[in-house]
Amino acid sequence: MNTFLLDYNTILTPKKGFPKLFRDYTSEGSQRDSLLGRCFHLDDRKEADYYRQLGLLASRRFQRDSLVDMLQTQNRRFGGGEVREREIEKLRSPRCMAVVTGQQLGLFTGPLYTIYKALSAVVFAERQKALFPEYDFVPVFWLEGEDHDYDEPAHTAIFSGSGLTHFRPETNRRLPDQMVGSTCFDASIQNTLEAFLDMLPPSDYREEVATILRECYFPGNTFEGAFASMLLRLMPKEPLILLSSFDPAFKRMAAGVFTREIETAPASSYNVVAQSSTLEELGYGAQTKPRAVNLFHLNQHGQRQKIEHPSPDLFTLAGESRQYSRHQMLELVSDHPERFSPNVVLRPIVQDTVLPTFAYVAGPGEISYLAQYRRNYEHFGITMPFIVPRGSFTLVEPKISRIMDRMLQVTGRPGFSRKQIYAAVFSDLEGMKKKAVETAENRSLEPLFQEAREEIQRALDRLLPTLSKIDPTLEPMLGASKAQAEKIVENIEQKTWKAGRRKHEELLEQILKAETALFPEGGPQERLLNICYFLNKYGTGLIGTLKEQLQGHSSESHIILEL
């Protein structure tokens, strides 16, 4: 296996590439300094901030016993085993911190970056334990199942043939605006699963992958239950703790945040708008638009209702005519916190209020919108944790590596290293394609053939005076020879062009195959492909390999991993 690291600032090829804010966050220089100084509280490159964060968390009060009891119950339900039980128990101590990550639930674990996030949290927690052995750091994966947008999580894709095949289960048991996590699969999940397995080619690992999927995805299981069980089965030895946020026990611990949101509404929205103005001053766009109240209400069917705030002391629930005073809404929060759900603005605040979050492992998009929340953290009286970029990979199969070698040859860049060819492809794929095709079409040969014709004609013309003196009848023979030589050169040229076109078609087909593998549907591979495609070919040991790569490299570079 070969590994190459690419700077995020050089990756310009995918049409849905990495945001400018994220590229600056992972780079060096004054732009990063301004961004960190004005939009975040902590810098993971400053040693002093680590000690500061340890002190801040040690001085705060958390409901640790309640948190541990809830997590133990949840992880037993998901099949977490003794490894997770021991890890959860550590949280009872005030010297235990959490390294948190999270992800929207996805079909069959969703896109590759779900796995990368989980492993990144495990690795970062291990690093902190090595740096601060007197403390414990536990990796926690937040199961984002309260979202009501079903279409995105209920989807996954794998390579099949020369392209991609997409999978979406049908469901007849889902209500509009129902939370994704509580959605139960009906019989159609079996059809989706078998169709998915049929697209996996025969291999030594296919049965293992099929067994894991069938044990997790079956009629009657919830979306959250299936996702959680599969994630744990893929990482049986990792101390990853799963957290379900719509557990009533969790909502009771988060009730203080809900109360302050209602008490001060629309203050949190004003905070986000003000912080977004700071971002715009720095040259970045805002990713998130806050609402007057950044909470949803859950009705008896588990459907999320927007909370509207039409006047200073009135609140309404979407779809209902009843009005609530601020006092009545606060009573509802106090009596039934399980009926409330944070939106994207409030979710990080809830997370870092309930958990002793030392660091949050975030994707590129998350880092962009977390930059809008600094003032809101201050509004709720807590400090933002370290925001650490997750690991980012492009997995390259052997057949694609061979195509990269071919591109090295045909583009006339044999002196390039393997890293340089990847850097060239990731920075300007279209330019590389054009260069390769031009070379394959032998456009540079046209002047060579013309030069050959002219040299032959000049050589024969030099014979003419001498031949005419010897025997004038030789002159017509010379003319015929010139025509014959022209025809020979033309014939060679035509055959060369035909051979070039064949090579051109073959090369173009190979380049398109590589493009599909590296940038499926024009975006980063990790945002679309499902891990099962690779596990079927290379076994579940691949997850251990990915962890080793994260242990050996910084997550502030994109990792090209040749399998």
UniProtKB/Swiss-Prot annotation:
Source organism (scientific name): Chlorobium luteolum (strain DSM 273 / BCRC 81028 / 2530) (Pelodictyon luteolum)
HAMAP family, A to Z: BshC (MF_01867)
Entry's family note: Belongs to the BshC family.
Any Pfam family matching the protein: CC_BshC
Residues in the signal sequence: none
Keywords carried by this UniProt record: Coiled coil, Ligase
Coiled-coil ranges per UniProt: 498-518
Its EC number(s): 6.-.-.-
MF GO annotations: ligase activity
InterPro entries registered for this protein in UniProt: Bacillithiol_biosynth_BshC, CC_BshC, Rossmann-like_BshC
Record protein name field: Putative cysteine ligase BshC
Lineage of origin: Bacteria, Pseudomonadati, Chlorobiota, Chlorobiia, Chlorobiales
Superkingdom, natural source: Bacteria
Gene: bshC
Coiled coil listed as a keyword: yes
